[in-house]
Every structure is written in structure tokens, then in C-alpha cells.
């Protein structure tokens, strides 16, 4: 996660829910959400990963005046290393797993605090 603390805003929740195609009114309708157990607009479970998109220093965010290194730069989205050939080591990494522990719903107005812990790593044989 790119930021240590991230305030959760109702507008960000609504835009995120729209972007994933989830029209559940608990993600945008304050009047509807007041009648639910959480008592307010809540964020979809995967919203926590979206906080990086609002951090101007996030390392994967495009930077003005700097060449883009990410997807669509090449046919696969991976720019080959010079002299890298086609074998192992010239490809990109694979994000295999994430784990989240939720203690309560994330409600608009909350502040999200992230803790990053290294997980297991492995290589394909």
C-alpha cells in the first residue's frame, strides 16, 4: 500500500463502485445506507487497494514529463530488457495473492491505516 493513512470519502467510494460495475445503493445512497447495520455508505471490500490511486507519490502512478514504463508500452505491457532474449528473467512478476482482514465495514468518514507485511514468495520450477 502506498500510503500510511487514507481518509475514506463518499465520492471515492461511489466512483470505485461504479468502476467495478456494482450498483448496490449502500455504496452511494446515504438515505438507503442509514437504514442498514453499518449506518452509512460503506466501501466495497476491494476498495482498500484503490487508495494508492489517490497518492501522488505512488510508484506505479504515471509521472508528468517521465516516460511511462507500464502496460501498453509493448504488446504484452512489458518492455523487454536489452539483450534479455525470450527466456526467464525478461518477463514481469505475477501477483499471486493478497490477504485482507476486516474487523468492521469501511464507512465513509473513516481513516484507513495500512500495515504491510512480507508474505511467502516462490518461483515456478
Positions of PLM-derived features:
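Hydrophobic beta-sheet segments that form the core/acyl-binding groove
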Residues: 96-125
Amino acid at each position: 500500500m502506498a500510503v500510511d493513512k487514507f481518509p475514506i470519502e463518499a465520492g471515492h467510494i461511489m466512483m470505485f463502485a461504479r468502476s467495478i460495475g456494482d450498483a448496490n445503493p449502500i455504496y452511494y445512497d446515504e438515505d438507503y445506507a442509514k437504514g442498514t447495520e453499518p449506518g452509512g455508505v460503506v466501501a466495497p471490500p476491494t476498495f482498500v487497494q484503490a487508495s494508492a490511486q489517490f497518492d501522488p507519490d505512488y510508484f506505479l502512478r504515471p509521472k508528468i514529463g517521465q516516460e511511462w514504463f507500464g502496460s501498453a508500452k509493448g504488446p504484452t505491457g512489458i518492455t523487454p530488457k536489452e539483450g534479455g532474449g525470450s527466456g526467464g528473467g525478461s518477463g514481469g512478476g505475477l501477483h499471486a495473492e493478497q490477504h485482507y482482514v476486516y474487523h468492521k465495514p469501511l464507512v465513509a468518514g473513516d481513516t484507513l491505516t495500512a500495515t504491510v507485511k512480507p508474505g511467502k514468495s516462490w518461483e515456478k520450477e
